[in-house]
């Protein structure tokens, strides 16, 4: 069985601690997808470029895309792989296995219809290695900034995974009263709820895509999604 673990930028502020969490989950064939939202925002702040989000997705012009590439590939990716190696995990950084189309609308260089190259990823997994994938996609004419949750779902579907695990700094999906929803088989119902907003929107869309693509179990923090989407 194969699983995908997606780890967000907030947890990657401390790579060693993040790897301890990954280590407890990475039994058997495991691929890692990482974001870097906090690191991207910090890099943009250094150059006085504002961060704008629409429906939980970062609006990405040329200046922002340059910062995304620098933060993800030059900072986060390198630090995470180093931390994985130090913990004895057989990490292999891989870039170029995610493709996307440019998303229509006001987002700029943001990818949609994300898909992953299962052949290349399986070649790494079959050697007993752990592919580590940043959330940058190859577009038709340029690199594209892609949502980490959507990327993780695409990788999980391509690899026909049994599990997709989102490691996040939030406890899980919360209801209108602020309590964590422990189990659900209906991400559509939650997407329609008024209490779901911000970054949880793309996360639940990713849960939906993964379940519809055949992933049997998806976990967001303490919230477990299982069954038909």
List the predicted regions and their residue ranges.
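C-terminal catalytic "cap/lid" subdomain
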Residues: 1-229
């Amino acid at each position: 069985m194969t699983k995908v673990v997606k780890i967000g930028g907030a947890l990657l502020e401390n790579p060693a601690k993040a790897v301890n969490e990954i280590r407890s989950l990475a039994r058997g064939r495991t691929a890692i997808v990482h974001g870097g939202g906090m690191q991207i925002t910090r890099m943009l702040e250094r150059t006085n470029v504002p961060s704008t989000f629409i429906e939980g997705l970062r609006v990405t012009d040329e200046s922002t895309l340059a910062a995304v590439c620098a933060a993800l590939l030059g900072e986060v990716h390198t630090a995470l792989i180093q931390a994985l190696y130090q913990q004895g995990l057989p990490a292999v950084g891989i870039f170029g296995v995610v493709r996307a189309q440019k998303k229509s609308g006001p987002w700029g260089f943001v990818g949609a219809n994300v898909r992953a190259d299962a052949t290349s990823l399986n070649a790494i997994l079959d050697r007993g290695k752990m592919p580590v994938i940043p959330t940058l996609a190859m577009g038709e004419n340029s690199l594209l900034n892609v949502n980490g949750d959507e990327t993780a779902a695409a990788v999980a579907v391509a690899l026909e995974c049994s599990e997709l695990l989102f490691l996040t700094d939030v406890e899980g999906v919360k209801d209108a009263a602020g309590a964590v929803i422990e189990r659900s088989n209906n991400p559509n119902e939650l997407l329609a709820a008024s209490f779901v907003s911000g970054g949880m929107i793309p996360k639940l869309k990713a849960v939906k895509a993964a379940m519809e693509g055949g992933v049997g179990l998806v976990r967001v923090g303490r919230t477990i999604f299982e069954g038909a989407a």
